[in-house]
């Protein structure tokens, strides 16, 4: 059902009565794959969702799924511009429903005021190192602009971008 790949790491796997949901990582990004036991489905939720996976500055994972006999899978999503969101995804009709989204204190936050992007730096050994950037959309990008930088990367550990 799942072929071996040196480029893909399986982080989590949930079994349901008619399908399995696989949380896998490739190039530092998490993808959620749905595979039906009868070979009737095999797709990535990232490609069948209204959530923004285009700018690649997100965290995405399987949520708490206590029901075995269901066609729904609970997921957790957030990005550098979207607060933590719990949603339920129907694997048959590929529709999602937001169950809960983290409230931002002060109620003045508007994600449309921010932009995020994913860039890469090349290490001495030629490996590409992902860099996630979030900024106000009006921030000037020049050498006078202050920057808060945080990073970690070793032993296969990835720091996923998260809303803060």
Model-derived regions: residue spans:
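Inter-blade boundary loops/turns of WD-repeat beta-propellers
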Residues: 25, 37-39, 91, 136
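Residue-level detector of Asp-centered blade-edge/turn motifs that repeat once per structural unit
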Residues: 15-17, 68-69
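Structural motif
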Residues: 28-36, 81-88
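Short strand-connecting beta-turns/loops that link adjacent beta-strands
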Residues: 6, 15, 26-28, 80, ...
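Serine-hydrolase catalytic core recognition
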Residues: 53, 61-164
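Multi-bladed beta-propeller domains
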Residues: 1-10, 14, 37-63, 94-112
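Conserved beta-propeller blade signature
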Residues: 20-22, 74-75
